[in-house]
Amino acid sequence: MINYKSLSKLFTLCCNIVTVIILFINIGCQTPQNKVSTGEHIISDSTLIQINVDPDGEESYAFDSLIDDISYIKLETNSDCLIGNIHQILCSNEYIFIMDVFVANAVYCFDKHGNFVRRIGKVGQGPGEYSRLCKMCLTSDQKQIVLYDWNRLHYYDLNGKHIKDVSPSFYANDIELINNDFIAGFIEAGMDDDSQRQMLSVYDKDFKLLYREFPSFYNEVFHLNNGMHPLRSFGNDIYLKEPWTHNIYKIEKDRCYEKYRINITNGGYPERPEDMNSDTYIKIVGTKVHMADYVILEDYALFYFSKNGFTWSPFVIYSHKTKKTYKCNGRYYNPLFFAHSPGNTPIVCYDKETFLIPQSATTVMRMKEQIYNSPLINDSK
């Protein structure tokens, strides 16, 4: 059903890490609801897709019955593109962009075969230079890459040529943009200039505020962010996973509406009393099955889950065509197929029906050992 690609990390002689990418393609319940306005610009209506997940349910499918193909892309390693830690990945039609925030503080461009092409931008204070990277985005026409650097947007073409620098009228931890149409900014603590401390702000191309939604969950005892980037771009659409919920919203210029709601039997994020601190709450969350990451493709949406003690990341696939949900049980019968876990780097679309997950060098070597020792391989000799 789905194709999947992997970036694997290979050790160089100086023990720096380069990356390898894994590609998957094709994945696999929608309940109509009365239209309800949950905020001035937030809509829940009949387009809401409710996905019911029972972690202990009997009906499930082998990994290799859900994934059509797996391939691996080994990224080139040389002194010009040493990657210490992958913070974010983006894919255009021609290139794979890797952002390393914490070690290299750089964005590297590779072709689809893993060959290093160029670096995008550089550290500095001049035009087209940045101090500390936060996020990168592709314009929806895939003609420009935008680096977000502590309240500055640096625009480049895909050949690395600097186009312009823009200083927005707001500060955010996370951003996404749709060409010159609108920009979404998000900060968990709430916008500084907003008395209601709402987390999401949507602006037009001139940074004029269009609307704000989602009041901050921060208080005196709880100020813990919910992991990865809340704002994500899949295709030409922007999505927001509301922190500490399983609700995913599609963000548009004049409104946002709830697109997916994940209902987990005996799981999910529990309600949090106002006086509960971050440490106590995260311990409780660890005992529950909860959503870890997701990716939205053209025909499918895939949702990964996590819980303390899990040795792999279970997932379900929702088919937009059949409107059915398929749960993976982690088993496989093809020794070349493995149920890879997404780790701490957000999953990204490689193309319309393929998603990409980075894998460490040690993981790739362990997979090779499993293949060589697999009874499915040895029994066929």
Regions of interest found by a model, annotated:
Residues 25-28:
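C-terminal motif of bacterial Sec signal peptides marking the signal peptidase cleavage site
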Residues 34-74:
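Blade/loop signatures of beta-propeller domains
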Residues 50, 95-101, 143-149, 181-192, ...:
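Short beta-strand elements that form the blades of beta-propeller/WD-repeat-like
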Residues 76-86, 106-108, 115-142:
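Blade-loop segments of beta-propeller domains
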Residues 79, 121-129, 167-173, 216-221, ...:
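Short coil/turn segments at the loop-to-beta-strand junctions that recur within blades
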Residues 86-88, 131-136, 170-178, 221-229, ...:
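Repeated scaffold domains used in trafficking and secretory/extracellular systems
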Residues 131-134, 148-198, 212-220:
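Asp-box/WD-like beta-propeller blade repeats and closely related beta-sheet repeat scaffolds
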Residues 259-283, 321-351:
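Conserved blade-ending motifs and adjacent loop-strand segments that build the rim/top face
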